[in-house]
Amino acid sequence: MLEISARLEEALNRAFTKVFPQEDRSSKTSSILTGSNLVPASKPEFGDFQINCALSLAKEINRPPRDIAQQIAKQLQQDNDFVRICNPPLIAGPGFINLSINSKTLISEIHFRLNDKRLGVPLKKFNTDKIEEEKSNNRVIIDFSSPNIAKEMHVGHLRSTIIGDSLARVLEFCGYEVLRLNHVGDWGTQFGMLITHLKEVVPEVLHTKDVVEISDLVNFYRQAKKRFDEDQIFQNKSRSEVVNLQAGDKESLIAWQLLCNQSRKEFQKIYDRLDIKLTERGESFYNKFLVDVINDLKNKKLLINDQGAQCIFLDGLVGKDGKPQPIIIQKSDGGFNYATTDLAAIKYRLTIPPHGDGACRLIYVTDAGQASHFSGVFQIAKLANWIPTDCQIEHVPFGLVQGEDGKKLKTRSGETIRLVDLLDEAIQRARDDLKNRLNTESRSENENFIDKVSTTVGIASIKYADLSQNRISNYQFSFDKMLSLQGNTAPYLLYALVRIAGISRKGGDLNVSSQNIQFNESQEWDLIRKLLQLDSIIAEVEKELLPNRLCGYLFELSQTFNRFYDQVPILKASEPSRASRLVLCSITADTLKLGMSLLGIPTLERM
């Protein structure tokens, strides 16, 4: 209802002008009247919107709030555009003004959505008149997932991957050009030990044209780490290998690329299962920019030499001992660290092409434990004047995935759970649930159906269970809860879609004409009002970067539809009620499918 609320805001401002002429307003009165005075109703029985400013104004102008409310309501009723949209305002309690959209407007909005693929969600318009050539004010970079080479993706990567993907989908739908970057950990001292181990254990891989598989890359990493920790000679060789790699030694680069390719294949298997699209641009990409970063910071007199290291001291950043804590930009041995690479990435991403990405907004999706790191890096980038005034840069933090005991989710042996194992178990549990249900219902389905449904439900449940939580909070992982057909779960949403598909299979044409639709039942109006909230919900997600707002809306929509489905006849209704209710079924299905696609969640028509 974004357009409706905007028109109501305009009508309200016109009423304010007549009731409170500009010349008679105090600064406090002006402040109240120019605030956000039109808000969604707190309860359905209060209508669609509320105006609550009469109470604040009463204290300022020393008049009873109901009198003020009555004057505002009177002016609204004389406003032609307001009358076209709303029923007469109702004054409640000490001076609240309740507004209800009239039926004609609601039906008009339903008509519009029936023929609109975007379901009433506006496409964002961007001002390109003053944008420099090759720079776009709608280009957004989302940095998410970012696993480390030679290590398996674990449950900790799940949140960054699916939250980042969902935000990318929403922003793309709103009209932004989104670059999804996978900032993989493909550089650093750990490659010294990995390359040394590879050269000694499987040297043939460096000289063959055939693709050689390292069957267990994780075990390979563990072997190399064990040798590094226990063998001083191996440790020295590994350190030398880091120098060789950084110097561009041909054989070392071949070994490094082989390790990266092996990891990339394993990562892609996970991304394919989760339907994640990413552009890989690892830490190594920024190596060539690191010296320029140091020189720029040095020229701007931001660096301080602290025991041979080049550092920046930020106001308020102190260690556990209370002493100022530096952010090291270049180590005393000349090496660089994560902060240096992240600074180079920020500079490149905000620089106009062809020397950078020309983004207007950077979004980093990582665990909350990195908040301090990014806060420091962002402050340095601002001090260096790398962030244009019209650009945004923000950290999108998320909490831990916990077991049902409230502790960090781990295997029984105390190890971090592999993401592939988590997905496999979700699908297997969904398969077991489906087979039990088929047996209970005496239903027979082929293996292809069972495979498709169990895979879809398993993946959907994993994703939705995460996205439906406020990302800032920790959440408790439970297969039983996420796979349940009851409550705020993916199966509950999918079941609403299945019900609508069932109506279509039973002869309900969801492509019916909307020429003569009419509604009489409260369940119909409840569903209409819920359907019309989609645009404002997506606007919230775009602004707040909280996918759980969309999940909550889809759950409420499914609940509202199920009440409508259970309490109002659809296929057996007489015309025009039958066609009108099929229209609502059609728009509900489209809304659920759109919303779930923005969450990256697959859908079904049969379960």
From Swiss-Prot:
NCBIfam families: argS. A motif ('HIGH' region) lies at residues 147-157. Signal peptide: none annotated. Keywords: Aminoacyl-tRNA synthetase, ATP-binding, Cytoplasm, Ligase, Nucleotide-binding, Protein biosynthesis. It comes from Prochlorococcus marinus (strain NATL1A). GO terms for cellular component: cytoplasm. This is Arginine--tRNA ligase. It is found in: Cytoplasm. The keyword Protein biosynthesis applies. GO terms for biological process: arginyl-tRNA aminoacylation. GO terms for molecular function: arginine-tRNA ligase activity; ATP binding. It catalyses: tRNA(Arg) + L-arginine + ATP = L-arginyl-tRNA(Arg) + AMP + diphosphate. Its EC number is 6.1.1.19. The keyword Cell division does not apply. Belongs to the class-I aminoacyl-tRNA synthetase family.
